Amino acid sequence: KKQIAYTVSYYSVPQNKSNSEVFVMNADGSDNTQITHDAWQEGQPTWFKDGKKLAFLCNESGSSQVWEMNPDGSGRKQLTQYEGDIEGFSFSPDGKELLFIAQVKTVKSTADKHPDLPKATGIIVTDLMYKHWDEWVTTAPHPFVADFDGNAISNVTDILEGEPYESP
């Protein structure tokens, strides 16, 4: 039987926060079941391992990482231990590689440029034709590719290493 996995976000105005949970249902719309019930943000559920598992993003470990679980919500296991938040991911067709998106620092802060001035926050910009944003941006999303053995990633490579560009 074919199944669909999706997320639902719940919002609390008094608490000024949201929570996302994962649901699974049959493709015909029957048996709609919530499979996560916790305070963590879970999202982007993706079928993998021949449809036997769901991969998803979760911030249970303190940052957004790729996790796996069974279609009934049991057997949760963290698959990545990347030092920052993973914002999106996709497995290669053979399941042996993981492509993921994460923010990388692209501009040195004033404190990085001038360690002798730790309280300085000013920035002088001389190479922009016009101001095109309303805040100073020091990171950009980069695509990373990593080997995946079914349980963990290794050989992580930033495809745009050293570049200030955003992708995707």
Task: Locate predicted features.
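Hydrophobic beta-strand positions that form the internal "hydrophobic ladder"
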Residues: I4, I35, G51-A55, L79, ...
